Swiss-Prot record:
Primary site of residence: cytoplasm
Biological source species: Aeropyrum pernix (strain ATCC 700893 / DSM 11879 / JCM 9820 / NBRC 100138 / K1)
Alphabetized GO MF terms: double-stranded DNA binding
Transmembrane segments: none
Protein name: Chromatin protein Cren7
Recorded superkingdom: Archaea
UniProt keyword NAD present: no
Keywords, ordered alphabetically: Chromosome, Cytoplasm, DNA-binding, Methylation
Gene responsible for this protein: creN7
Length: 64
């Protein structure tokens, strides 16, 4: 199976405090009941190897 390469997103890495450009591992919509939701991405810090979540743009494609 071939997956499309998603474009990188500029996010702040909470483990190092630096602004980095990363491609999310997974993207999903998080929406509370009765309100408009936001898209969240799962990222892996290149320096520490820890995983973190951050908001991605609303027009970003969702993954599995």
């Amino acid at each position: 199976m071939s997956q499309k390469q998603l474009p990188p997103v500029k996010v702040r890495d909470p483990t190092t405090g630096k602004e980095v450009e990363l491609t999310p591992i997974k993207v999903w919509k998080l929406s509370p009941r009765g309100r408009r939701g936001v898209k969240i991405g799962l990222f892996k810090s290149p320096e520490t190897g820890k995983y973190f979540r951050a908001k991605v743009p609303d027009d970003y494609p969702e993954t599995g």
